[in-house]
Each structure stands twice: as structure tokens, then as C-alpha cells.
UniProtKB/Swiss-Prot annotation:
Subcellular location(s) of the protein: Membrane
GO cellular component terms given for this protein: membrane
Residue ranges of the TM segments: 181-201, 250-270
Glycosylation site list: N31, N95, N105, N108, N137, N147, N277
Keywords assigned by UniProt, alphabetized: Glycoprotein, Lipoprotein, Membrane, Myristate, Transmembrane, Transmembrane helix
Lipid-substituted positions (N-myristoyl glycine): G2
UniProt name for this protein: Uncharacterized protein L323
Membrane topology label: Multi-pass membrane protein
């Protein structure tokens, strides 16, 4: 489950980033461009595979990229639950424009102390798209906003994956919403009935030597013993076998542990998956 969730998260993140980078037209570059120390973090699961290609088409304007990243982040974030959006510090509105403004305000405030007039070296901007791009004309503040928006997109992708999965083992087993809760309750009741039946017949068999003495009332005996025998093919043999091997203790313990795990997992709150460069992420 973990590997699958990680893959799905990366696919969502790649889609948002690639659409943002590809939505901006190419811009001209200077005659000489220094690429020493460039930060190109090619993600996994790129389709087509990631590539580092230098040319006139490998450039993108920083302001266009920032706007596109914020739009992509807003589009994905608007589909998250109110709880997830609140956890990210994003407006809980379902209106994409309001969510986009909220994301812009977050990154703007995070990078508030940086200059808006000096153009930074391209090495200050991290490229996370599958295809390499040279980000042109970025001020210190815009570069900071681009990096922080990309990190925010990573968190949005993690929450989107967790939300789709149900957010916990409970969601994976039973699905989300009311239907999942009802299914869990039904399964727990069935397990409880099985445990009760096993415990009852074990206690009764320990008090009596033969199956015919399990209960003295003939009608009740016929109902309980006969019905149980038809269900498992011989209650006394089944119970005797369990008692001799102590297997019933293991079965009861295993079922109880399963119930406890399921109940605990229903209280799990989806947490964003940790990513590299957590120090640059928005909290």
C-alpha cells in the first residue's frame, strides 16, 4: 500500500508541475548562460522520462511560471477536504479563485523579506518538472515563491493521495464515508458473534463430558447443538480439537487484535508524506 500511495502521489505532483511549466511560452536567453550548480530535481514516474535538454525552448519566464504553479496548486487544492486545506493553511473555500489567492498570499508572506528588483542567478530556483527549464528574469522574491509553491504542491499531492485512499487502513479496508463505517460495524458484529459462539461452546464442553450433556433442555439442545453441528460439521469434535491444541486461544486473540487495530486506524488523521527539502516547505 505504501509504495502504491507514494507512486500515485508522485504522479499527481508531476502532472501539476508539468502542466504549469508547459503552459508558459519559451523566452529568449542571453548569449551566455551559466549552469554551474543548477538544481534540477527530476522526479520519479515521469512519462515520458525526465530529460535535461538545453536549447531556446528550455526557457520559461519566472512570473509566468509562478502564476501557472499557483493556478495548478489551487485547482488541485480546491478538491481537498476542508480539513486538509485548513491543515495546509489554505482557504477552505471550494472556489478556485479564492484558493489561488490564498496560496498566493501564503507564498508572498513567506518570501516577504526578499528583494523584488534584483535578478537572481538561475541556480537559486529549483526545477522539479520532468523536463528541465531555465527560469529567466526571476527576482529573489519570485524565485523564493516558485520554490515554496512547488513544495506546497508536494503537500497537496500527498493529501490528495491520502484522501483518495481513505486516509488510513480503515479507508483501504472498508472505503470512506458512511458506507465504510457501516461495513466495519457489520464485520465487527459478525466477529463478535463468532467469538461468543466459540467461547460459549468451549465453556459448555468443559462442564460436560459428552456433547449430549451440553444442555438438559431437549428443545434448546436440539436448536443450539444441532444448528452448530450443521454449521461446522460437529461441534464437540471441533471444540475438543481446539482445546487439545489451544488453537482457540490463538483464534480469539487474533480476532481481538484485528478489531483493536481497525478501531485505532479509524482515528487516524491523514498526514502529509515527508519530502526532501522539508526546511523549505510551508507550514
Amino acid at each position: 500500500m505504501g509504495a502504491s500511495a507514494s507512486t500515485n502521489e508522485q504522479i499527481i505532483e508531476n502532472r501539476i508541475l508539468n502542466e504549469a511549466y508547459n503552459s508558459c511560452p519559451s523566452v529568449g536567453t542571453a548569449n551566455v548562460t551559466t549552469l554551474s550548480g543548477i538544481k534540477f530535481e527530476a522526479p520519479a514516474n515521469c512519462n515520458p522520462p525526465s530529460a535535461f535538454v538545453i536549447g531556446q525552448t528550455a526557457t520559461v519566464d519566472s512570473n509566468c511560471l509562478l502564476t501557472s504553479l499557483q493556478k495548478g496548486a489551487a485547482s488541485a487544492a480546491s478538491k481537498l477536504s476542508s480539513q486538509s486545506k485548513a491543515g495546509l493553511g489554505i482557504s477552505v473555500s471550494t472556489n478556485i479563485s479564492e484558493v489561488e489567492n490564498s496560496i498566493a498570499n501564503i507564498t508572498n508572506n513567506t518570501c516577504a523579506g526578499l528583494a523584488t528588483n534584483n535578478v537572481v542567478d538561475i541556480t537559486d530556483t529549483v526545477i522539479k518538472a520532468c523536463q528541465f527549464r531555465v527560469v529567466q528574469n526571476a527576482s529573489s522574491k519570485v524565485s523564493c515563491q516558485i520554490n515554496n509553491t512547488q513544495n506546497l504542491i508536494s503537500k497537496i499531492a500527498a493529501d490528495a493521495t491520502s484522501q483518495a485512499k481513505g486516509g488510513s487502513l480503515f479507508g483501504d479496508l472498508f472505503g470512506g464515508g458512511l458506507g465504510g463505517i457501516i461495513a466495519a460495524i457489520i464485520i465487527i458484529v459478525i466477529i463478535a458473534v463468532i467469538i461468543g459462539a466459540v467461547v460459549y461452546f468451549i465453556k459448555q464442553s468443559s462442564k460436560n463430558k459428552g456433547a449430549e450433556k451440553i444442555i438438559e433442555n431437549p428443545e434448546t439442545a436440539a436448536l443450539l447443538v444441532g444448528g452448530f453441528k450443521s454449521f461446522i460439521g460437529g461441534a464437540s469434535d471441533f471444540v475438543d480439537g481446539l482445546k487439545k491444541t489451544n488453537m482457540y486461544k490463538f483464534i480469539v486473540l487474533l480476532i481481538m487484535v484485528l478489531i483493536i487495530v481497525i478501531l485505532l486506524k479509524t482515528l487516524d488523521i491523514p498526514n502529509p508524506i515527508n519530502h526532501p527539502n522539508d526546511s523549505n516547505r510551508i507550514y
